[in-house]
Structure formats: C-alpha cells, structure tokens
C-alpha cells in the first residue's frame, strides 16, 4: 500500500503550502513510500478525493482543503488529524501502517 497525499501545487495560501511540505518532509524523513497527487491539475483526481472522504469528516462549509492523506484508497485524514497523530506519536497508526519501514544498515 502506498500513502497518497492530495495536494495543491499552485495554492496561493502560505498555510496550505507549509502544511503540505510538513507532511511530505515527515514521510521522506521516515522513509515512507508516498505518491503526490496534484488536485489543481487533474479534475478527476480532485473529484475522486472529494468522493472518498467520509461524509462525517467533510468540513461544515466548503470543500476539504489539501493536504488530504490516504493509504491507497483508504482515507486517513487531513492535516489537523496528521498533526494530532504526530504530537501523540501515533502517526503510523494514523497512516494505517503496520510498523515503521525498515532502516537500512550503513
């Protein structure tokens, strides 16, 4: 399974850009395989993301903002959920990964 991070490459929001970067840096630092899905360029990907976020996790107003995180086709959460899991040291559970990726011996 691959972690998919739905993001907006051309967002004018500094906050969104920082949040996207934080998620990607965490995944890279922990050697977690991931795929970036740019919803600004592909309408079908944006619509897929909207349809696959559980109704109880949608914002009360407007559309869900990036980054949105999936494990393959299973919704994990948004940035706030990711941040909370990072703070409570439960990111691997949040990402629905069995364990940390194996570290290579140097």
From Swiss-Prot:
Entry keyword set: Nucleus, SH3-binding
A GO cellular-component term linked to this record: nucleus
CDD domains reported in the protein's UniProt record: GRX_SH3BGR
Keyword Nucleus: yes
Originating species: Xenopus tropicalis
Name by which UniProt lists this protein: SH3 domain-binding glutamic acid-rich-like protein 2
Domain of life of the organism encoding this protein: Eukaryota
UniProt keyword annotation of Transit peptide present: no
Alphabetized GO MF terms: SH3 domain binding
Protein family per UniProt: Belongs to the SH3BGR family.
Chain span(s) of sequence motif SH3-binding: 61-67
Compartments where located: Nucleus
SUPFAM superfamilies found in the cross-reference section: Thioredoxin-like
């Amino acid at each position: 399974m691959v972690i998919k991070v739905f993001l907006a490459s051309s967002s004018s929001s500094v906050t969104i850009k920082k949040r996207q970067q934080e998620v990607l840096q965490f995944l890279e630092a922990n050697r977690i395989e991931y795929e970036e899905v740019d919803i600004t360029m592909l309408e079908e990907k944006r619509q897929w993301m909207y349809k696959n976020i559980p109704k109880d996790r949608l914002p009360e107003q407007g559309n869900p903002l990036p980054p949105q995180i999936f494990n393959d086709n299973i919704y994990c959460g948004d940035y706030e959920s990711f941040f909370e899991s990072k703070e409570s040291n439960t990111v691997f559970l949040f990402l629905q990964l069995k364990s940390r990726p194996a570290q290579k011996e140097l």
